[in-house]
């Protein structure tokens, strides 16, 4: 009954429910989990979104298309998609992950979305998988516009400082917590002529640096 409700939310009925069950299974819960599906789904998602952007923005150059795609397939965006389906309610997690609130964690939710995309592909083929991606992303694709906002925070901050002939920011990892497979990074960002030290957090060093750069952008009012 639970999977029936989820399939209605997804807008897709599986011929082989085993694919969906595996897509919902985190590595903490079973050896037959969604990691391989996530790997496959990531490729399908990138292709589907890339094709949609290529068709929607015929005048966009390669860099602009890449930045827009990155914004749509990043962890935070996938987590938004996951919450639309309330995926956390359907996932199978180990006791430790459940206790620590893994069903709310963006990294776990985003991986699950990618795994479900792969599950649809294995169940019904590439056309059906791409159709579901386009449906789930329809509003996000409609809202997508060319422009500065598609550049990641580090790039925007760097270009802002370079345009004013100021030194580039310095990033430093100040803390790492958690096991090797589930780490949280804390990074500081320092900008010359700004007294404040900005702190960012993320599941990788790169994500933490992006988060720190975003804090700088907000304070400096960079558009």
UniProtKB/Swiss-Prot annotation:
GO BP: any one term: rRNA processing
Active-site residue list: 42, 114
Keyword entries, A-Z: Cytoplasm, Endonuclease, Hydrolase, Magnesium, Metal-binding, mRNA processing, Nuclease, RNA-binding, rRNA processing, rRNA-binding, tRNA processing
Positions bound to Mg(2+): 38, 111, 114
Enzyme Commission (EC) number: 3.1.26.3
SMART domains in the record: DSRM (SM00358), RIBOc (SM00535)
Cofactor(s) for this UniProt protein: Mg(2+)
Places the protein is found: Cytoplasm
Catalytic function, reaction form: Endonucleolytic cleavage to 5'-phosphomonoester
Function field: Digests double-stranded RNA. Involved in the processing of primary rRNA transcript to yield the immediate precursors to the large and small rRNAs (23S and 16S). Processes some mRNAs, and tRNAs when they are encoded in the rRNA operon. Processes pre-crRNA and tracrRNA of type II CRISPR loci if present in the organism.
Gene Ontology CC annotation, any one: cytoplasm
Organism, scientific name: Glaesserella parasuis serovar 5 (strain SH0165) (Haemophilus parasuis)
Ranges of residues in domain DRBM: 152-222
SUBUNIT field: Homodimer.
GO molecular-function term, one example from the UniProt record: ribonuclease III activity
InterPro entries named among the record's database cross-references: dsRBD_dom (IPR014720), RNase_III (IPR011907), RNase_III_dom (IPR000999), RNase_III_sf (IPR036389)
RNase III domain mapped to chain residues: 3-125
Presence of the UniProt keyword Ubl conjugation in the record: no
The family this protein is said to belong to: Belongs to the ribonuclease III family.
The protein's name in its UniProt record: Ribonuclease 3
One Pfam assignment: Ribonucleas_3_3
Highest taxon in the source lineage: Bacteria
């Amino acid at each position: 009954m639970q999977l029936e409700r989820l399939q209605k939310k997804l807008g897709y009925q599986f011929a082989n429910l085993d694919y969906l069950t595996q897509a919902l299974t985190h590595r903490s819960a079973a050896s037959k989990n969604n990691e391989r599906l996530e790997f496959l789904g990531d490729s399908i998602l990138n292709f589907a979104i890339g094709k949609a952007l290529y068709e929607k923005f015929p005048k966009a150059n390669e860099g602009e298309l890449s930045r827009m795609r990155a914004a749509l397939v990043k962890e935070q965006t996938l987590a938004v998609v996951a919450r639309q389906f309330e995926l956390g309610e359907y996932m199978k997690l180990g006791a430790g992950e459940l206790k620590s609130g893994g069903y709310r964690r963006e990294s776990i939710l985003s991986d699950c979305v990618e795994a479900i995309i792969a599950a649809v592909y294995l169940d019904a083929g590439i056309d059906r998988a791409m159709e579901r991606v386009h449906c789930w992303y329809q509003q996000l694709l409609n809202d997508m516009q060319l422009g500065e906002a598609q550049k990641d925070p580090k790039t925007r901050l760097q270009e802002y400082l370079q345009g004013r002939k100021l030194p580039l920011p310095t990033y430093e990892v100040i803390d790492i917590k958690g096991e090797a497979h589930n780490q949280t990074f804390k990074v500081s960002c320092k900008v010359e002529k700004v007294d404040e030290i900005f702190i960012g957090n993320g599941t990788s060093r790169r994500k933490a640096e992006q988060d720190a750069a975003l804090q700088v952008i907000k304070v400096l009012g960079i558009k």
